From Swiss-Prot:
GO MF, any single term: rRNA binding
Organism: Dinoroseobacter shibae (strain DSM 16493 / NCIMB 14021 / DFL 12)
Every S4 RNA-binding domain range: 94-154
Name of this chain's protein: Small ribosomal subunit protein uS4
Pfam families: Ribosomal_S4, S4
Record family assignment: Belongs to the universal ribosomal protein uS4 family.
Function: One of the primary rRNA binding proteins, it binds directly to 16S rRNA where it nucleates assembly of the body of the 30S subunit.
Taxonomic lineage from the root: Bacteria, Pseudomonadati, Pseudomonadota, Alphaproteobacteria, Rhodobacterales
């Protein structure tokens, strides 16, 4: 098992949920967290615990973002006009690695980050190797021609457990996608419930 895969499953176990909807997730087999104390009976969470968990789950879903990365995105969501929770989701979904994942060019968000880092992705014809690059509406994201026969890509396009959302227009024959619009919370196909409202409450007190 690769370090990336191990980290992904550790996040699932820590959250006690299959947050990416993957059939091989360990929480499909057991309902307790990682480590020797994971099997202890779960206690009712405090409000703070629920808020922290909501933040950790959202951070984990987008590739286990660091607190510094996530806090910076949250601060921007708070600054711009509109609902902070909706803004937060929109900014996360506009990350280049998130769009590559949504387009089903790769099997996992962790693979998307590595794929972008290694220079396999073009945005409007220019190579971009920064996973956090902010995609705009109308941007065309494509896999470099030399990279299109990679096994991970061919596997990802056939994954049955997730579909391409309607705010990403993907053509798997050309390995090209257009970012149609910035989504809101209700548009994003999360396999589990995400609660940005609790994230707002967390940062309001910390």
């Amino acid at each position: 098992m690769t370090k990336r895969t191990s980290a992904k499953y550790k996040i699932d176990r820590r959250m006690g949920e299959n947050i990416w909807g993957r059939p091989k997730s360990p929480v499909n087999r057991r309902e307790y967290g990682p480590g020797q104390h994971g099997q202890r009976r779960k206690q009712k969470m405090s409000d703070f615990g629920l808020q922290l968990r909501a933040k950790q789950k959202l951070k984990g879903y987008y590739g286990d973002l660091t607190e510094k990365q996530f806090r910076r995105i949250y601060a921007e969501a708070e600054r711009v006009k509109g609902d902070t929770g909706e803004n937060l989701i929109g900014l996360l979904e506009r990350r280049l690695d998130a769009v590559v994942y949504r387009a089903k060019f790769v099997p996992t968000v962790f693979a998307a980050r590595q794929f972008v880092n290694h220079g396999h992705v073009l945005v409007n014809g220019e190579r971009v190797n920064i996973p956090s690059y902010r995609v705009k509406e109308g941007d065309v994201i494509e896999v470099r021609e030399k990279s299109r026969q990679m096994a991970a890509l061919l596997e990802a396009t056939q994954l049955p457990e997730r579909d391409v959302p309607d705010y990403v227009d993907a053509d798997h024959n050309k390995m090209k996608a257009t970012f149609v619009r910035t989504p809101g919370l209700a548009d994003v196909p999360y396999p589990v419930m995400m609660e940005p409202n609790l994230v707002i409450e967390y940062y309001a007190q910390n």
